[in-house]
Amino acid sequence: MNKSNSVKRELAKINYRVHTDAIKENIIIPLEISKEKASVVYASEADVLNVAMFGMTAKEWREKNPDKKGNIRDYAEVSQLVCLSNLENLNAYLIDNGVGQQERLIELNKSAIRQMKVFETENLKLTDGVSDTLNNNQVNK
């Protein structure tokens, strides 16, 4: 994975721990789900985010893109990854507050649409060049 993709992936993981902890504390532990079945729950919740952001599950994306290596997030724009990170945090909040998966999907999709409109309207789409500039500035300080 090149530096640009690495930076984009790290950005997408910012709220990952908050998200997975909410799943564990509010779904896995209370329902006494086995370790084997827990991975299915985590994957299902990841797909809630994928559908809210990209309109398809990871499996659907792989089926539509058999020639591409990696996953849907590896090919996302930086602005989409920023939005996805925000959605992870929002989903954790909704899980903590007992909101069901279908209702969360609706709210997450609304939030994704709203955020992406802001990025487009305000011309705030981030580019890899911005990321590289920020990284270079941090190194030079």
Model-based region annotation:
Residues 1-141:
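Positively charged, phosphate-engaging catalytic surfaces used for nucleic-acid and nucleotide handling
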